[in-house]
Structures are given as structure tokens and as C-alpha cells.
UniProtKB/Swiss-Prot annotation:
Keywords on record: Aspartyl protease, Cell membrane, Hydrolase, Membrane, Protease, Transmembrane, Transmembrane helix
One GO term describing the cellular component: plasma membrane
Keyword presence, Signal: no
HAMAP family found in the cross-reference section: LspA
Protein role: This protein specifically catalyzes the removal of signal peptides from prolipoproteins.
Name of the molecule in the record: Lipoprotein signal peptidase
GO molecular function, one term: aspartic-type endopeptidase activity
Family, per entry: Belongs to the peptidase A8 family.
Subcellular location as annotated: Cell membrane
Transmembrane segments: 55-75, 84-104, 124-144
Pathway given in the UniProt record: Protein modification; lipoprotein biosynthesis (signal peptide cleavage)
Species: Listeria monocytogenes serovar 1/2a (strain ATCC BAA-679 / EGD-e)
Length: 154
């Protein structure tokens, strides 16, 4: 059940950071955090992570509810006793719920983290997006490690 605490922490941090951005920054405003690398940039997104499929909100409502239900089912049925698996699902669930809250309440998602690598500007994202990414990476690690254990590889 500890994994639900991770989910709640992700949701709380996501919503708090978005609230701070909305209360203190104009849309489009940019604050340099680490010169030439990291900026807080107030942006609104009506698509998925990194602005994928902008303008199709009904699709995200439906998909997100289904995904949240599936993740909770998997957590209850299969994740018990599998620490890395349950943690990865907790991060994915927290990210999904964090952005879902924005979509339901505001019909858009608040994004604000912007990174720059030389001349490349990575798409602006938020804590929920980062949590989804961390969850997927942890899931891949779990699958790789579990596969090696199953095959008896050290």
C-alpha cells in the first residue's frame, strides 16, 4: 500500500507546482533557473505529454479513466510483493491523475519545465509528465531485471 503514498505525493507536488506557476507567472513568461539549461516557462497544453494530439480533450478523458482503472487493477492484483513494479506503477498513476485533474478542471494542462540542450529546446513539461517518464523507465528496468531472473542470468 506504500505505493499509493508515492502516487499521492506525486499528485500533491504536481498540483502545488502548477498552482504556484498559475498564481505567479503570466502565460509565456520565462524564468531562468540554470543559465542556458533550465527555465520555468508558463505554458498551457490541451494535448498529451509534450503537446501530442492537442485539441482532442474527450479522447484524453476516456483514455485516462481507462488507464487509471487498469493501473489500479494491476497494482491490486499483480504488484504486491514486487517493489520496483509497484513503485513504477505508482509514478505512472500519479502522473496520469495529476494531468487528468488539470484536464477536468481547466480543459488544459499547466506545463512549466523547459530544458535546453545547445540549440534544442525540449518540449515544456510538468511534474506529472516527469513522473510518467520516471514510471516508464522504472517499469523497463523491472521488466529487464525480472526477465534476467526468470532466465537465471546474473
Amino acid at each position: 500500500m506504500y505505493y499509493y503514498l508515492i502516487t499521492l505525493a506525486v499528485i500533491a507536488l504536481d498540483q502545488l507546482t502548477k498552482w504556484i506557476v498559475v498564481q505567479n507567472m503570466e502565460i509565456g513568461q520565462k524564468i531562468e533557473v540554470i543559465p542556458g539549461f533550465l527555465y520555468w516557462t508558463s505554458y498551457r497544453n490541451d494535448g498529451a505529454a509534450w503537446s501530442i494530439l492537442e485539441g482532442h480533450m474527450w479522447f484524453f478523458y476516456l483514455i485516462t479513466v481507462v488507464v487509471i482503472g487498469i493501473i489500479i487493477y494491476i497494482m491490486q492484483k499483480y504488484a504486491k510483493g514486487k517493489r520496483l513494479f509497484s513503485i513504477s506503477l505508482a509514478f505512472i498513476l500519479g502522473g496520469a491523475i495529476g494531468n487528468f485533474i488539470d484536464r477536468v478542471l481547466h480543459q488544459e494542462v499547466v506545463d512549466f519545465v523547459q530544458t535546453v540542450w545547445g540549440n534544442y529546446y525540449f518540449p515544456i513539461f510538468n511534474v506529472a509528465d516527469a513522473s510518467l517518464s520516471v514510471g516508464v523507465v522504472l517499469m523497463l528496468v523491472y521488466v529487464f531485471v525480472d526477465d534476467r531472473k526468470t532466465k537465471g542470468i546474473k
